Amino acid sequence: MKIALVHDWTIHMRGGEKVLDALAELFPGATLYTLFSDRKKLSPNLRRLRIKNSFLQYLPGIRHFYRWLLPLMPFAVRSLQIEDADLVISSSHCVAKGIRKPAGAFHICYCHTPARYLWGFEETYFSRFIVPVRRLIAFFLDRLRRHDLESNAGVDLFIANSECVRERILKFYKRDAIVIHPPVDI
């Protein structure tokens, strides 16, 4: 069975990347698709994978300003072409679940959370900006929400990392999920 792993970005080893590391240990022959990465910051399991990055990888200094590129991320993840896979496993808190799966492939999304800055925590993320900037952000957030909802169509099975996330998936995506707690200390 050919397996593709997908993660939003891999530039450090935080909670989501530790889950991805556990998946890489289970599927050492998988290819990893990600928006951008920094191999030097990754675990040995992740460094051993074949890594395919989006065009965002080639922007100088991407690690320092990637949050400002959020409006481009849905396009970037859709630009990644999974060459051949029977199973796609996305580890997603942003746009990874929006990857195009090959015909006949099954897509499991291990959802760390529906994107907080889109669903319920906008004030936490954007209240510090002046009003004209917040209006511009609201314009993009509306489009990003639509993309986020549309990208759910390609997911065959949602796995939530907690009961709280399962409830958020049900509330915002109108999809059920099974709960599998992270297999790592986070």
Where are these regions (language model features)?
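Nucleotide-activated donor-dependent transferases that construct or modify glycoconjugates
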Residues: M1-M13, L35-F36
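Short beta-strand scaffold positions
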Residues: S90, I159-A160
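Short amphipathic alpha-helix
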Residues: G16-L26
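Acidic anion/phosphate-binding donor-loop and adjacent secondary structure
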Residues: K171, I178, V184-I186
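Active-site donor-binding segments of glycosyltransferases and PAPS-dependent sulfotransferases
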Residues: L26-K97
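Active-site proximal beta-strand in glycosyltransferases
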Residues: L87-S90, K101-I130, I178
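Membrane-proximal helix-turn-helix segments that form the acceptor-binding/catalytic region
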Residues: F126-F158, R166
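Carbohydrate-associated surface elements
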Residues: C164, P183
